[in-house]
Amino acid sequence: MQEVEKLKLLQSEREALKSRIKVKEQEKKAENHTETVCPECGGRQLVHDYERAELVCQSCGLVIDDDFIDRGPEWRAFDHDQRMKRSRVGAPMTFTIHDKGLSTMIDWRNRDSYGRAISSKNRAQLYRLRKWQRRIRVSNATERNLAFALSELDRMASALGLPRNVRETAAVVYRDAVDKNLIRGRSIEGVAAAALYAACRQCSVPRTLDEIAEVSRVSRKEIGRTYRFISRELGLKLLPTSPIDYVPRFCSGLTLKGEVQSRAVEILRQAGERELTSGRGPTGVAAAAIYISSILGGERRTQREVAEVAGVTEVTIRNRYKELAEKLDIEIIL
C-alpha cells in the first residue's frame, strides 16, 4: 500500500510540474507575442530597421518598437577586410576541419605581438612547440583519417567550384560514415568522393559521377558502388536528379541569356508532366532542351558545343531533341 501511495504522489507531482512548465511557456509566448506578430493587422512580416532602432510591420507600416537593442558590434566596417581586422572573435566552427576549427596554430613568422624578431634561443623553443602542436592536433587514427579525408574533400570541391554548403554537407556525411565504421575495407578517397557526390545531390547542386571521378583519385565504378553503400547504410533520402537542376550551369557554360534558360526550363517542365524524362539521363535531356531553346531564342549553339559542356555525345542530343520536339509539338527550323 505504501508503494502505491508513493507512486500516486510521484504521479501527482509530475502532473503539477507539467502544468507549471506549460504555464511558463504560455507566459513566455505572451511576452514575445509583440515581437513576432503585429498587434494592428496580425502580420508576421516584421522588419528590423537598425539605423532608427525600430521594429516595423511590413504589411501595414506600424512601428511596433522604437527602442530595441542593437546586439551587433560597436565598431563600423565598410568592407570584408575591415570587418576581419576589427573582429575580436575567431573563425566559426566548421565540419570541414578534423577538429572543427577549434584548435589554434603557432605562427611561422618568428615575431612577437609587437612585430619584433624573436631571439635564436626562443626561436628553437618555438620550433619544438610547433612540432609538438602538430602531433597533438592529430592524436589518433580516427583524427588522421579525418584530416586526410577532409583535405581531399576540400581539394575536389575546389576543383569542381562547389559552394560552402556542399562542402559542409559532404564533411558531415563522411563523419557519419566514420562514426558507423563504414570506412573499413574501403579507400578513404572512394568514401570521400562518394560523400561529395551525395552532398551535391542533397544540396541540389548536381554533378555527375564522371565529373566527380575526373577530380578524384578513384574510378567512377568505385565511387558509384561506395555511394550506394553509404546512402543505404546512413539512410540518406536522396531524390532523383532533375534535368532542370543542370540547366543554369550548362547555360552559363554556353554564355546563353536568361530568356533561353527560362525557355529550356519550361520545355523540361512540360516534358516532365508528360513523363518524357523518365528512364533517361538527366544531362542528355537537359542538353537537348537547351539546344532547342537556343535555336528558338536566336542564340543557336551547335550540337557539338552543347555536348562538350554537358558531357554527353552528339548522338544523345540528336535523339533527345527529336523526341522532345515531336512529343511537345515544337517546330524547329534548322
From Swiss-Prot:
Mapped Sequence repeat ranges: 151-234, 245-326
Keyword Metal-binding in annotation: yes
Single GO MF descriptor: DNA-binding transcription factor activity
GO biological process, one term: transcription preinitiation complex assembly
Annotated Zn(2+) binding sites: 38, 41, 57, 60
Entry GO CC: transcription preinitiation complex
Zinc finger boundaries on the chain: TFIIB-type: 34-65
Gene3D superfamilies, A to Z: 1.10.472.170, Cyclin-like
Annotated family: Belongs to the TFIIB family.
Name of the protein in question: Transcription initiation factor IIB
Lineage: Archaea, Methanobacteriati, Methanobacteriota, Stenosarchaea group, Methanomicrobia
Record gene name: tfb
